[in-house]
């Protein structure tokens, strides 16, 4: 209290007591006691002199003015009183005004001199102080009453042995006290006061209570009676609070043992039973299991030996019935950095308050922000912990607001005051205390609280190293408990007798006290071990039984539909991303810059004479297509790799809301797919423009977009499976390099390791690579559907097939037939084996051959399988193969002639064939899909002749309806007996893989596998 206000208050006290007969000795003694309480000893005389001067205490009785003069003085004093009160009114808080009014009433009541003039001045004070009439009457009756029967107010509570003479509206509790302890609640300011009407010796926070004197009953206060009984602040205010009385809530936790994955015991023998309206702290040294205990009680961890029940419902078995009952605020920052204070709270509210309209949600959000003192910061981005635009205390309050917006019945908080200033810490705990007074049950882990904060808790749970509980009860009583347990001299004193402060550090100094060696130096050995403390705890503390409610707990959660959840998640994430300017800039420029760099490097004067750039002769086009796919994979992976890791902490909190995991994933995928669509389009637009790839923009974009979407889902999988962004980014090269190796470009599929390779077809291991499907689709589509080639593709296919059969297959079959003629009677087993292979090859090729002119009429099965081959048949086959070769030469020539005629027709109609070919056709790509660079045009593999040349012109040869496998670069694929374009078939495959990995993401298969592997590793170490 400032000097100016204290002088004004002194004048006010003097004016009141000078009325109607002047100052009595009792009144003056009351003022002296007040000054001694508020001032240093040296200043008491100065203020007492001021009081005596104004009150006229030193005047003789004969010097008093007559009655008429007294009345005039009274009027003057009333005006002066009004002026003083207005002056005080501008400085004191409402709580301080209530205390001043009580002191004034105590002063008047000290001599029972209730005159009209004094009463009028006191009424003036209460009016100027804006104290409601009901509360003034309550305070006046409380301060002046000698009989409890006159205190007929609902804000009065009587503690005594027998409820005799109780007024109808009063509350009553039983207490072993002679006389009556009278408690008063001033609801408007949330303050409690106590008077003792009796002759016994009771102590309040260690001070002897003078009978009839009014005392502030503040947070953490304890009244002790002569018989050793105690009345705690937390228990008494619960009797005042109607919300606590009407809330049906019970929380019972019985945790016999909890082990971590590595087998270490984290929690032992914990039993907690609580009802509504409690603020309960959990303290302990580092590694004592505070956060573990909190997580078990919140349901984040499951104890193998123990249960946690809310209103009789198991938190793990009855999740649906307990939906929305629990709230959790972790020690970590759970804010979305890119959103504003308002947006963080608004989108959270939309996810849990679906029953409210948009206007109602907006109103509630603004109200919560105002209550937390954040309304002036609502439009600021919260930023990161390091790059922050709001203070640490404001961040903590906003984190708590995420749960307060829906007001769960039970709230768990992990060190909500860590890293905060003492003022911010008090604000946070004040907020939680107010919430507990509304009937909520709150548990929080706290570290090194101040005295004021420590006394705000209703109960304190103390944990010791190894997960042992060693105390469970009133916070202030904990100090005396541990002092008595260690036989300290001042064991009866729990707080400072002068200021009332408590020192929580004292508790840990006692708990962790070390044994001193013979040199007076502390050793590492503790005087009392955790087990010994726990044994004392078990013998002295029993969880007070509470009524186990059977009703479904009060629900404050209203979840929107899954579709609406998806929309809210998407809106929130989209807003966060567009608000992050560096993120947006990098992701928007990444693709066009890479395309520009890549296309610029590989564009050169490719004309045969080196004079200009011609697309047809650019040998880098196949490599560009491969790099386009790798870039699409890279962008898709990098943009999604941190998405779930970044949200991991937020997801942990939102797990209590039972929101749809699928809705969350769909929101992520929607935004990532949109971003991938933009990135791949800008890449293709820039790359195709520079390299003059014409007519392929949308076809290439669809492939790259599909590839990038696949990478998005893969990135989300690894983001879900691992907890470290570093791990994820280390994995990206491990994912991309196999995609390059097995793309079919760097290494020939026919020349891979024999364990992997399947000659003539793409290996199964390569079929797992998206790059293989994407690259094949792009190259085949570019060759088959470019503006130049698409008119001739059908003819060239027939031409290529005829050329292969006449030039390569006929010759190979002829050689096989000659070999059989030369070895009609095999000399040894090795020759016999070669003979059988040749027969097998001839049989397989001839049984499906459409050209049969000159083919022996004998049954092919009889000839080649059942040893029916003779010299006569061999000679007939020799003549047949000659005819076979000539037949396909004719087909080849006919199709070549058709192509020439078609070209001639186009040229005759004004088309520049050469220009068209230069613009749309690429020689290197053509050589790639035709495989003209290979020396082997046909090869034998496992009794089959495999065509190596011209895979683009081959037709699929499925062995069964589901047989999709075919040579690389084939133009068409088999799908359930139907022939489908390779481009669309490969698109379908990539989207199928994407869907498969989405299911893996939804069910978290990879995360579970990583978890199993981690557990297996831990078991090996053990």
What residue spans do the PLM features occupy?
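ABC ATPase NBD Q-loop/coupling interface
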Residues: 307-321
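Helix-to-loop junction immediately C-terminal to a conserved catalytic motif
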Residues: 298
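Alpha-helical transmembrane segments and their short interhelical loops
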Residues: 438-445, 450-454, 459, 663, ...
């Amino acid at each position: 209290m400032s000097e100016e206000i204290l002088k004004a208050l002194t004048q006010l006290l003097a004016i009141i007591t000078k009325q109607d007969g002047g100052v009595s000795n009792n009144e003056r003694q009351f003022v002296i006691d007040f000054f001694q309480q508020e001032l240093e000893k040296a200043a008491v005389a100065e203020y007492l002199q001021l009081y005596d001067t104004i009150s006229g205490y030193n005047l003789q009785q004969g010097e008093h003015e007559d009655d008429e003069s007294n009345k005039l003085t009274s009027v003057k004093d009333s005006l002066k009183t009004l002026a003083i009160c207005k002056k005080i009114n501008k400085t004191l808080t409402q709580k301080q005004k209530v205390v001043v009014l009580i002191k004034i009433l105590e002063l008047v009541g000290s001599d029972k001199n209730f005159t009209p003039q004094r009463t009028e001045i006191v009424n003036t004070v209460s009016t100027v102080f804006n104290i409601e009439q009901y509360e003034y009457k309550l305070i006046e009756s409380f301060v002046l009453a000698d009989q409890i029967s006159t205190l007929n107010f609902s804000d009065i509570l009587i503690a005594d042995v027998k409820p005799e003479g109780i007024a109808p509206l009063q509350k009553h509790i039983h207490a072993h006290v002679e006389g009556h302890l009278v408690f008063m609640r001033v609801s408007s300011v949330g303050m409690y006061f106590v008077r003792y009407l009796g002759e016994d010796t009771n102590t309040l926070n260690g001070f002897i209570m003078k009978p009839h004197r009014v005392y502030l009953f503040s947070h953490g206060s304890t009244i002790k009676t002569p018989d050793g009984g105690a009345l705690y602040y937390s228990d008494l205010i619960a009797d005042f609070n109607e919300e606590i009385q009407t809330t049906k809530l019970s929380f019972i936790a019985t945790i016999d043992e909890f082990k971590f994955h590595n087998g270490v015991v984290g929690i032992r023998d914990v039993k907690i039973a609580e009802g509504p309206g409690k603020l309960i702290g959990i303290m302990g040294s580092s590694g004592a299991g505070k956060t573990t205990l909190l997580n078990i009680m919140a349901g984040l961890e499951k104890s193998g030996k123990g249960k946690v029940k809310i209103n009789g419902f198991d938190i793990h078995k009855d999740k649906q019935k307990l939906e929305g009952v629990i709230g959790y605020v972790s020690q970590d920052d759970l804010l979305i950095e890119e959103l504003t204070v308002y947006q963080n709270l608004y989108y959270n509210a939309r996810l849990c308050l679906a029953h409210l309209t948009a206007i109602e949600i907006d109103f509630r959000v603004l109200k919560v922000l105002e209550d937390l003192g954040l309304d002036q910061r609502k439009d600021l981005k919260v930023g990161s912990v390091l790059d922050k635009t709001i203070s640490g205390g404001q961040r903590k309050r906003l984190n708590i607001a995420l749960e307060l917006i829906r007001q769960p019945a039970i709230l768990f908080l992990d060190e909500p005051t860590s890293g905060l200033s003492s003022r911010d810490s008090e604000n946070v705990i004040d907020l939680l205390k107010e919430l507990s007074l509304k009937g909520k049950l709150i548990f929080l882990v706290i570290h090194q609280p101040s005295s004021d904060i420590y006394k705000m808790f209703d109960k304190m749970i103390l944990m010791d190293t190894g997960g042992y509980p060693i105390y469970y009860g009133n916070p202030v009583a904990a100090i005396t408990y541990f002092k008595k347990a260690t036989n300290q001299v001042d064991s009866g004193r729990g707080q400072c007798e002068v200021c009332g402060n408590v020192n929580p550090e004292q508790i840990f100094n006692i708990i962790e006290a070390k044994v001193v060696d013979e040199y007076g130096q502390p050793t590492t050995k503790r005087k009392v071990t955790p087990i010994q403390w726990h044994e004392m705890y078990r013998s002295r503390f029993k969880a007070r039984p509470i009524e186990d409610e059977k009703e479904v707990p009060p629900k404050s959660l209203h979840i929107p539909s899954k579709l609406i959840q998806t929309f809210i998640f998407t809106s929130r994430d989209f807003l966060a991303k567009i608000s992050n300017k560096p993120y947006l800039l990098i992701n928007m420029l990444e693709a066009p810059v890479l395309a520009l760099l890549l296309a610029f490097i590989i564009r050169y004067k490719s004309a045969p004479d080196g004079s200009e750039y011609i697309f047809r002769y650019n040998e880098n086009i196949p490599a560009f297509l491969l790099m386009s796919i790798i870039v699409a994979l890279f962008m898709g992976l990098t943009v999604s790799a941190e998405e779930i890791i970044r949200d991991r902490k937020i997801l942990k909190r939102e797990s209590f809301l039972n929101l749809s995991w699928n809705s969350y994933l769909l929101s992520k995928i929607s935004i990532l797919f949109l971003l991938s669509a933009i990135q791949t389009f800008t890449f293709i637009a820039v790359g195709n423009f520079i390299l003059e790839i014409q007519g392929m923009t949308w076809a290439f974009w669809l492939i790259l977009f599909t590839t990038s979407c696949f990478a998005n889902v893969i990135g989300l999988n690894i983001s879900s499976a691992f907890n470290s962004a570093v791990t994820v980014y280390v994995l990206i090269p491990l994912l991309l390099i196999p995609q390059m190796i097995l793309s079919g470009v760097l290494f020939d599929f026919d020349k891979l390791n024999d364990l992997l390779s399947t000659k003539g077809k793409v290996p199964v291991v390569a079929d797992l690579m998206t790059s293989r499907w994407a690259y094949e689709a792009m190259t085949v589509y570019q060759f088959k559907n470019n503006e130049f080639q698409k008119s001739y593709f059908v003819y060239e296919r027939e031409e290529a097939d005829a050329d292969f059969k006449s030039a390569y297959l006929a010759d190979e079959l002829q050689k096989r037939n000659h070999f059989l003629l030369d070895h009609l009677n095999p000399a040894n087993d090795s020759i016999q084996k070669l003979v059988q292979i040749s027969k097998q090859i001839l049989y397989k090729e001839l049984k499906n051959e459409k050209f049969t002119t000159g083919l022996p009429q004998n049954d092919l099965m009889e000839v080649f399988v059942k040893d029916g081959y003779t010299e006569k048949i061999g000679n007939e086959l020799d003549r047949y193969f000659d005819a076979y070769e000539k037949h396909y030469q004719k087909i080849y020539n006919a199709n070549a002639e058709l192509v020439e005629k078609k070209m001639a027709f186009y040229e005759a109609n004004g088309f520049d064939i050469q220009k068209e070919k230069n613009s749309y056709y690429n020689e290197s790509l053509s050589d790639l899909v035709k495989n003209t660079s290979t020396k082997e045009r046909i090869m034998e593999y496992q009794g089959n002749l495999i065509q190596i040349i011209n895979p683009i012109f081959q037709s699929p040869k499925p062995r069964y309806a589901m047989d999709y496998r075919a040579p690389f670069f084939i133009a068409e694929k088999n799908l359930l007996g139907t022939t489908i374009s390779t481009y669309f078939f490969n698109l379908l495959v990539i989207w199928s893989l994407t869907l498969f990995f989405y299911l893996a993401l939804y069910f978290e298969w990879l995360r579970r596998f990583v978890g199993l592997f981690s557990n297996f590793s831990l078991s090996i170490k053990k």
